[in-house]
């Protein structure tokens, strides 16, 4: 079984102007819709010992985009969900990944960016790969503007703050990170 979670809506407003109802509506469609659909298929995948789950995030969600606090929150929450389900699904034959597409669609055409040149048919091969036998586990695959790349979230190189760390040292330490 394969689940591709791709439902979405936009309710763009700056954080100061977005209503809680609009914020919740975006979370309900993007996050809770994906949770409900995936939950419905999960036990079947476990029983079959095989499955693929693809969540749809977004570069706007991952890196931020003005006026999209609700959208970014929902899209990053899906990445957190992917991270956990990839761990839980690993021993059960279930591969869980996230697609971060960048293409002009009906939903995004009003936000036209002259630098954006991607089309949905350039994203489709990424979806097919994430649903294939060769699918990776726990990967964020960006398919944007005719190019593919992975997006990784990882800690930077740590610095040793010594045995006693005093908060007033923070401003001097942060640039070293």
What are these regions (language model features)?
Residues 13, 40-49:
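A short helix-coil junction within the Rossmann-fold of NAD(P)-dependent oxidoreductases
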Residues 14-15, 22-24:
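Substrate-binding pocket helix/loop in short-chain dehydrogenase/reductase
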Residues 18, 64-72, 84, 112:
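Active-site loop-to-helix junction immediately N-terminal to the catalytic Tyr of the SDR YXXXK motif
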Residues 38, 74:
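Active-site helix of classical SDR
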Residues 58:
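Residue(s) in the substrate-gating loop at a strand-loop-helix junction
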Residues 63, 79, 84-94, 133-135:
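Active-site-adjacent segment of SDR/Rossmann-fold oxidoreductases
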Residues 115-177:
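C-terminal helical subdomain
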């Amino acid at each position: 079984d394969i689940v591709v979670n791709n439902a979405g809506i936009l309710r763009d407003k700056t954080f100061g102007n977005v209503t809680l109802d609009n914020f919740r509506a975006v979370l309900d469609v993007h996050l809770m819709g994906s949770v409900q659909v995936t939950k419905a298929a999960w036990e079947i995948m476990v029983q079959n010992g095989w499955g693929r789950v693809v969540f749809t995030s977004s570069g706007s969600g991952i890196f931020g985009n003005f006026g999209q606090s609700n959208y970014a929150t929902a899209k990053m929450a899906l990445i957190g969900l992917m991270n956990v389900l990839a761990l839980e699904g690993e021993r059960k034959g279930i591969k869980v990944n996230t697609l971060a597409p960048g293409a002009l669609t009906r939903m995004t055409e009003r936000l036209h960016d002259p630098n954006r040149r991607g089309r949905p048919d350039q994203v489709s091969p990424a979806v097919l790969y994430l649903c294939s036998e060769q699918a990776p586990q726990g990967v964020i695959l960006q398919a944007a503007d005719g190019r593919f790349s992975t997006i990784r979230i990882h800690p930077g190189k740590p610095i040793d703050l010594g045995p006693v760390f005093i908060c007033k040292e923070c401003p001097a330490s942060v640039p070293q990170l």
